Amino acid sequence: MRIAGVNLPLNKHAVIALTHVYGIGKTSARNILERAGIDPAKKIAEMSDEEAHAIREIIAEEYKVEGQARGLQQLAVKRLMDIGCYRGLRHRRSLPVRGQRTQTNARTRKGKRKTVAGKKKAVKK
């Protein structure tokens, strides 16, 4: 079954399968299923077309998902960078934003190590 351009895994419970859509977490998934009147433990493969349609309608009306949510996220980061705040500068320099240490660690954010040549050892005679 496809929702918001994402193929949901048929063998999983509805509440878990909905979290495969970017922008929908467990809480949102539970709220969607509650509004649609669907049991969260029901598997996606067992859902009728009417139930799938109800889920699609609720998501289309109330939630920003997939490309729309990613675009909003990018705009939020771009805004921080444009106003020149500390968080924006950290994003611009590809450094950790939330106060983590950077002398060691932070490899995920900084990327692969850029090696710097050390001092050459003097040859003893």
From Swiss-Prot:
Gene Ontology MF annotations: rRNA binding; structural constituent of ribosome; tRNA binding
The name this protein goes by in its record: Small ribosomal subunit protein uS13
Superkingdom: Bacteria
Keyword Signal (UniProt): no
Signal peptide: none
Species this protein is from: Prosthecochloris aestuarii (strain DSM 271 / SK 413)
Key words of the record: Ribonucleoprotein, Ribosomal protein, RNA-binding, rRNA-binding, tRNA-binding
Origin organism lineage: Bacteria, Pseudomonadati, Chlorobiota, Chlorobiia, Chlorobiales
UniProt-annotated stretches for the region Disordered: 94-125
A GO biological-process term: translation
InterPro entries assigned: Rbsml_uS13_C (IPR027437), Ribosomal_uS13 (IPR001892), Ribosomal_uS13-like_H2TH (IPR010979), Ribosomal_uS13_bac-type (IPR019980), Ribosomal_uS13_CS (IPR018269)
GO annotation, cellular component aspect: cytosol; small ribosomal subunit
Subunit structure, as described in the record: Part of the 30S ribosomal subunit. Forms a loose heterodimer with protein S19. Forms two bridges to the 50S subunit in the 70S ribosome.
SUPFAM superfamilies per the UniProt record, alphabetical: S13-like H2TH domain
Function: Located at the top of the head of the 30S subunit, it contacts several helices of the 16S rRNA. In the 70S ribosome it contacts the 23S rRNA (bridge B1a) and protein L5 of the 50S subunit (bridge B1b), connecting the 2 subunits; these bridges are implicated in subunit movement. Contacts the tRNAs in the A and P-sites.
Family: Belongs to the universal ribosomal protein uS13 family.
Entries under PROSITE patterns matching the protein: RIBOSOMAL_S13_1, RIBOSOMAL_S13_2
Biased composition (Basic residues): 107-125
